Amino acid sequence: SPAEGNLNKFRKPLIPAYTDYTPWDELNDLQKDSLDLEMSVFAAMVDRMDQNIGRVLQKLEEEGKLENTLIMYLNDNGSCPFYSNKFADVQPGPAHSYWCLRASWANVGNTPYRQYKQCGHEGGSHTPFVAFWPGKIKPNTITDQVGHVVDIAPTFLDILQIPYPETISSYPTLPLDGSSLLPVLMG
């Protein structure tokens, strides 16, 4: 078929870049306050998460289990600009708010990559993966090796030296997706 037949007739051949990014200096005080509150709440959630991860690590250390524990921390996608608050008049912060970052902050959250979850750009898919395993993973190392969430099960099976079963309760299993990240973790 001709190329013009493959175009989305509603969006036209060339789609302008989506953006709601307005330079900070061009925002009015109310807009600045709203964006400031949004990022303050997000930062508070990150801080709360960090404190609680610290509590888990402290408990593992107190019980003498930290040295024998592999901890993986990752997320499945980059920041996401959802405008899906359940109540129009609720600002970010209360427990009944489902306020997410707007596109401008979501894009900043994925720096240095462009865009966010809904887009095909790296900001939506190129995310951090942090692994901590005392005595096994060399501290303060960084790799550019690509991995995916489907690599976690093969990694743990490899670490524990457990073969992936061919059957479960006499039913054949599907092939396991992913690859072990153990060689990457070990340097």
Locate predicted features.
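Short, intrinsically disordered, charge-balanced linker/junction segments flanking boundaries
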Residues: 176-187
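Active-site-proximal cap/lid insertion segments
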Residues: 1-175
